[in-house]
Amino acid sequence: MKKIVVLSDTHGNLGAIYSIYDILLESDMVFHLGDHFDDMNELSQTLGDKLYRVYGNCDFGRDPKEILVEVEGLKIFATHGDLYGVKRSADRLIERAKTLGANVVFYGHTHSAEIREVDGITIINPGNAERYGTNKSFSYCVVSGEKITAVINKNID
């Protein structure tokens, strides 16, 4: 069983990240989906190789923009989402996931938290944790075998 924390769109709000510090340390994997990718720099040494990051549209020309990670038989496709026009529709994102053979998609960019399933693919957007945003949130996931269970947690400052 793997415990995964997914964050996105922190936009410089280090307080939000540190408000879940213990949860980050206790997790097996931490994904930051961009828009202020560098917000995780201070924790990168502490989290080590359990930290996975992709760059967002506010991270200006950096790579990687997407990654594919296998966890207990599940393929997780992680991206910020801007490359796929997710503010209009998730269709292109879902097609990319299918092309990659992904079972799970983590994405951000919209600042709107959601968990849903489309064509057998679990789609998770943790929402945003930006300083001036409303409804700050992150996602907490548990992978057991080839099954993922996810919740949106709004207990973030």
Predicted features along the sequence, with ranges:
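N-terminal active-site segment of His-dependent metallophosphoesterases
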Residues: 1-49, 59-65, 136-137, 141-147, ...
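Short acidic, glycine/proline-enriched helix-loop-strand junctions
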Residues: 49-50, 115-130
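Active-site neighborhood of phospho(di)ester-bond hydrolases with catalytic His/Asp-centered motifs
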Residues: 6-8, 29-35, 52-56, 78-80, ...
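Beta-strand-turn-beta hairpins that frame and shape the catalytic cleft
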Residues: 1-5, 68-77, 117-123, 143-150
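Active-site environment of divalent metal-dependent phosphoester hydrolases
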Residues: 11-15, 37-41, 58-63, 84-88, ...
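Binuclear metal-dependent phosphoesterase catalytic core
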Residues: 18, 71-72, 95-101, 124-157
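An amphipathic, basic-hydrophobic alpha-helix
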Residues: 89-95
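Helix-adjacent hinge/juxtasegments
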Residues: 50-88, 100
